[in-house]
Amino acid sequence: NVGAYIGEEKVLRFPERSDNLFLLEYHASAIEIAQRLEALWALQEGRECVVVSSARALLKRLAPARELLAKPLMLEAERDYGSSPTSDVSGYEDVIEQLVKRGYENTGKLEGPGSFSAQGGTIDVFPGNLPYPVRLDFFGDELEEIRRFLPSTGQTISSLKAVEVYPVREFEVTPKGKAHARKKLARPAETNQVLRELLVSLEDDSIECPDALMPFIYEKTESVGDYLSSKALTVLVEPRSLVDDAIHSLNKLAKKAEGTSVTVESLYLSANGLNFGTNTRATYVSIMRIGVELDGELVVKRVDVAGDPEKLFGRLRSLVDAGFTVVFSVPHFRARNEMKLSLVDLGIPIKEVLDVFGSS
């Protein structure tokens, strides 16, 4: 668990899309999309964090990074956006416009992640990236308060200084994108029923455009590797397995695509086309020994115990007596102190190293 070493708040996941992208209806999970876009924005901005993903998740084609579609709507309490606007917001109405732009649906009453409602000077929104909804209380164009609340009762749980609302759509249908899609679809749609339906959904603002339209909206699609900042480090664990996993996933996708007239290639990269970026890279592979003598060896073992504390401490004693160094990462202060006291009582030598320079 990477979060145990660097803190859960610094670990983000870029999950695989679980919905069927070959369908002409839009069935994406707002939580899943927001999670993916939060990870992409962190990579694009060069944030200090670790993004964990799989080969299957990296196969999906994305909108060009320059479109900044992963950018969150950032709001601060006690800020008058009329006199102190941002690039996205200069008042109450802009917040509504920006939510719609990011894929949020005005449902009149909250219907879970990806929905919002606006009444009077109050906007209730359920961000896809948060496990709770927030209430934005405006007075004119001043955002007086941001409150976390219970949607069932409206009861306030706590006030927040700021909130980031991540998009719940991976592409945006702009007038320019519409024109580009019309041009690419017009002729083939004359003889293809599915493409005709895509063209209809493009023109109908009352329905969500399916992901199958995304390749037609942009001149060129990109992938996760194109979102990486120059300072990013890409870590590949067992590259051969990553490629095998991608091939297996593409075979399953090909079965889903059968009879839809939407090609796998239009929505996904090939296994050989996986893009890990042009930045610094670290690769971890298993080494098989075949009659080779090693100059030196560092043996790493797992404690390999579960449940009973006595088993844990007994195993620790045997490892220490055998000359091993055992590393514990205990972020929680009270748990760390309890562990120290137990080890001292059992006569097991310890050394504490804190994540503060010069402290030990």
Which role fits each region the language model picked out?
Residues 1-360:
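Conserved beta-alpha structural segments and adjacent helices that either
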